[in-house]
């Protein structure tokens, strides 16, 4: 009987702790809006660092675009609150990388985080050999996604199949490399800079270069330096964020690290409307903008508050095709 009472008391305590944590969590989390250009550290998955940053900011809603491999560092855009509505406008933008690769070794993940599966001699490779091969990867190319990737097959990421030793056939996909340039070359290593389209696997490019050099190659360092119009200088690393939190113990100081949502749309033409029009748009009322005779995406600015409230796609007949507004 005593044991039964103890079990019931433990169950009651666990249930209380669970309910308490859920209630506190909901009250504790904040509705914040903005974009953090995180300098992702090496060794963590993009999703894991997202959860850490979300917890640090005590944010109710957050997401990211442009997955970076655990080996990679650099720009990982994290979107908070209403900013998540507009993240898809960065999905198809170009990305810039700096890469360091090692010759003579091929790994199962195509980077140094994997297992070496083949070692071959490096035979008389010259700088000109590499530069000539690089020219073959400029422009429109077709590449097969690596098995160790987050690309899904039947709802399951490919890397999970790879870890189980299951091979999944993949079709080649078209990507675009705007430029690829050799930065340095030594006997065992070479460094590149590359600007490429969405969906480009730079690990696969390095692996293909290694095969064309008949010795194999894999990435040992990978850093995303730029995405869209955001530059490397705009990034902030997680250590700095934690230091800000520790020093000031003020979430508003962390919020100062966020870029406004409208930073995505700096180059868009502006349409200024009063709050009455904005409220009608919020309520789903279709309006015509007869004075606009050009098919374009516009940034909406409130005439009353002078603040960004969303974007609207207007066709050449002055009709709104689509609208996205912040709350």
Curated annotation (Swiss-Prot):
Substrate binds at residues 97, 201, 222. Its EC number is 5.4.99.25. It is an enzyme of class 5 (isomerase). It catalyses: uridine(55) in tRNA = pseudouridine(55) in tRNA. Keywords: Isomerase, tRNA processing. GO terms for biological process: mRNA pseudouridine synthesis; tRNA pseudouridine synthesis. Pfam families: TruB_C_2, TruB_N. Gene3D superfamilies: Pseudouridine synthase. The keyword Cell cycle does not apply. One of its GO terms (molecular function) is tRNA pseudouridine(55) synthase activity. The active site is at 69 (nucleophile). The keyword tRNA processing applies. Responsible for synthesis of pseudouridine from uracil-55 in the psi GC loop of transfer RNAs. PANTHER family: PSEUDOURIDYLATE SYNTHASE TRUB1, TRNA-PSEUDOURIDINE SYNTHASE. Belongs to the pseudouridine synthase TruB family. Type 1 subfamily. This is tRNA pseudouridine synthase B. It comes from Wigglesworthia glossinidia brevipalpis. The lineage of its organism: Bacteria, Pseudomonadati, Pseudomonadota, Gammaproteobacteria, Enterobacterales. The gene is truB.
